[in-house]
Amino acid sequence: MTVEETLAELVSIDSVSKRSNAEIIKYLAARTEALGWRAKTFPYRDERGIEKVNMIAVAGTDAEKIEVELALVGHTDTVPFDAAWTDALRLTERDEKLYGRGACDTKGFIAAALTAIERIDLRKLRRPLALVFTADEEVGCLGAKELADAHALSARYSIVGEPTSLQPMRAGKGYCLAEIILRGREGHSAYPALGASAIFRAARLVRRIEIIAEELKAEQLAAFEPPYTTLNVGIIQGGTAKNIIAGECRFTLEWRPLPGQAAAYLLDLIRAAIEDEKSRDADFDCSLEVIRLDNGMETAKDSALVRLLEEVTAREAGTISFGTEAPQMAEMGAEAVVFGPGNIRVAHRTNEFVPLEELRECVEILSRAIERFCL
């Protein structure tokens, strides 16, 4: 089966994050088991009670504890698609580009990995190899976190599939989210002294957060764009009517820490700002809930995996600022590199696509990596 045919079958399976991914995992298990691989599933239920499944397919070892030389990692879920995109689940080719939901992010990589392993004579494997297929990457890398928490896998090297236009990415920023809630006291807006505005309190805190965001620019890594930890207040909600003093205001805080900077570092700065506001206003009522706290990752320039991918692509390893499952693979012991066909800038949009030439080239590159580390 060609890589294009495999991608067409993967795209035809609706695996939007809000649904169970059991169907696509069943397909992947059948494909790998037919080649003599051992497929082990790790089911769990998300916060809505929907069944999700991670899977690790292993070759070269029968040990119960999965320890491998190289792991190829791809997430099976996709973002939703607009109903007007009627061909979202049917792979279509135009101008040497393959269109379909997930074609770029990240079913193209999965198709390339499946095609690459079909070339392997398992009898010649000298070191174990794994394919790792995860759920819920698009909603917080939850599947990969399940695997890391369960110590389901140990790997020396890992290629984490994401659309990087076939440029190896050896370092990435972390991704963190928190919700901050401020409470005041409702009252008629004509009589401000009778209430306390939660929105005014939020505004004071947001201003302090803006100052912190500027201060974070002092610590920089030139390889990143932008080269500092970014901080954003993306959502803010408060009040119930124009003539009522707001009793509550909440906002979402997002930050992307540089590798080497603890994800919790910024939390300490925010909490210090909150405590300072409380010292100035005894009624300052504020709570902070951490939603996601993922550290950045960095694999050394002289890593054998980095050097190999630089050699076969003739491109210097770079860095990324978007979230991936590389930090979870690093937790499981791997020197991780993010890599795959397609461009992140066309992911998540209607008419997402992967260039056919890149898809085919990815098969060759993954084959080279398998040959280098496992054969």
Residue ranges of predicted features:
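Residue-level signal for inorganic ion chemistry
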Residues: 10, 14, 162, 202, ...
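Short beta-strand segments
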Residues: 73-74, 132-134, 158-162, 181-183, ...
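Alpha-helical metal-binding/catalytic segments enriched in His/Glu/Asp
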Residues: 72, 92-138, 179-182, 193-213, ...
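Acidic, glycine-rich active-site loops and adjacent beta-strand->loop/helix elements
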Residues: 76, 97, 132-139, 163-166, ...
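Acidic/His- and Gly-rich active-site-bordering loop/insert found
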Residues: 1-98, 122-125, 343
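Metal-dependent amide/peptide-bond hydrolase catalytic core
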Residues: 170, 177-375
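Acidic-glycine-rich active-site phosphate/pyrophosphate-binding loop
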Residues: 79-94, 155, 170-181
